[in-house]
Amino acid sequence: MIDAYVGLGANLGDRMESLRAAVEQLAREPGFLLRGTSPVYETEPVGPPQPRYLNAVVRIGTLLSPRATLRRLLEIEELLGRVRRERWGAREIDLDLLLYGDRIVADGALRIPHPHLHERAFALIPLAELAPDAYHPQMARTAAELLSTLPEEARQQVRLVGKLRRTLPEPDGGPAGGGSPPAPTDPFPKVC
């Protein structure tokens, strides 16, 4: 099974709920095994003026090919209400395939590692938090090493908001991720 890392982003509607819904959908996918989630960060948008984003990264195990993985991510976006308006525009949900094991893929629209991963704090900070040793095969550096090369100004524009919690039961019927089930109240503050 290959470890793949998926960047999550949302800046329209209930952003936290969009991220949670994406994680739950990824956990339900027959071809994916959810292996971890980063904390959630609020970030400035890249591109035209628009609301701030919430971003996170998840690690999934998969036996699907890189192209099939990307196809499923796009289908999940559509299922969750993604409407493609303009490049780098506001979105209800965005799922980006950041890394797929140590593979390098350049096939049409599919580029792995994600071509801007090494320069974007909103992706590198949650990736390095989740998996500091995740390896970028083109840059020959880990996520933590790449993060250390970003300017301090870029890192300061990314603000920790909280944690994503899976609410789906594990196959054995226990709480997701082990331990106690999540508290019944929402621990995340509303972020505008």
Where are these regions (language model features)?
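Flexible, gly/pro- and Lys/Arg-enriched active-site loops
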Residues: 36, 43-54, 64-70, 74-174, ...
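N-terminal beta1-alpha1 ligand-phosphate binding loop
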Residues: 1-42
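Short, low-complexity intrinsically disordered segments enriched in A/P/G/S/L with frequent Arg
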Residues: 179-183
